[in-house]
Regions:
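Active-site phosphate-binding strand-loop segment of PLP-dependent enzymes
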Residues: 120-173
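N-terminal "arm"/small-domain region of PLP-dependent enzymes with the aminotransferase-like
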Residues: 1-43
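Conserved PLP-anchoring active-site segment centered on the Schiff-base-forming lysine
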Residues: 83-98
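General beta-strand structural signal in soluble alpha/beta enzymes
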Residues: 18-20, 66-69, 113, 136-137, ...
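Short beta-strand elements in bilobed, periplasmic/extracellular small-molecule ligand-binding domains
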Residues: 109-117
Length: 175
């Protein structure tokens, strides 16, 4: 392990206090593993991409994965506009669930696939048994430092006879 890089990372992370859950902004592994990648025709890039996609397929139990480059918000728009339909329950947890609500309302207005949206506080989900097509939420709501176990959301999904869609864009390393 390169101690000068490790000290650099420690010093940078020490200078700025983060009061949200999750790993530090600057990680030793990110600094030491970074390398230039071109994409098309780049063997090293292809090797890394294949490794990542193989792991994603394994943990998600999917045969195929569509990959796109973009922000977390873009990923959520893709999810909502392409998969969510019918009667939707969004779990209210904070700013990021508000973003899901806003995007879902836009999708409902523009594409008419979403028929009804209920927005219910996370503290009330144990009471729910209403049938939905989809349950959507943010298991890690960094705006308020909240983490809801995915297993709890999975139980809700089963009670509501729904599919589960999660905004896990802020939860890397926190599950």
């Amino acid at each position: 392990m390169n101690t000068s890089v490790k000290k650099f990372v420690e010093n940078k992370n020490f200078k700025k206090k983060l009061f949200t859950p999750g790993p530090a902004s600057l990680l030793y592994e990110n600094i030491t593993s970074i390398e230039p990648c071109f994409g098309r025709g780049d063997y090293q890039y292809q090797k890394i991409e294949n490794n990542v996609l193989s792991k994603l397929k394994k943990i998600s139990n999917h045969k195929n994965i569509a990959r796109m480059q973009g922000s977390a918000s873009f990923a959520l728009e893709v999810m909502i506009n392409n998969f969510i339909y019918g009667k939707l329950l969004i779990i209210k947890t904070g700013i990021y669930s508000d973003r899901l609500l806003s995007m879902s309302i836009a999708c409902k207005t523009n594409f008419k696939k979403i028929k009804k949206i209920d927005y219910i506080d996370y503290q009330k989900i144990d009471e729910l048994t209403t049938k939905y097509d989809w349950v959507m939420g943010c298991p890690v709501e960094t705006s308020v430092g909240l983490k809801i176990p995915i297993s709890k959301l999975n139980k809700l999904k089963k009670r509501c006879k729904a599919k589960l869609a999660l905004d896990a864009t802020a939860s890397i390393g926190l599950e």
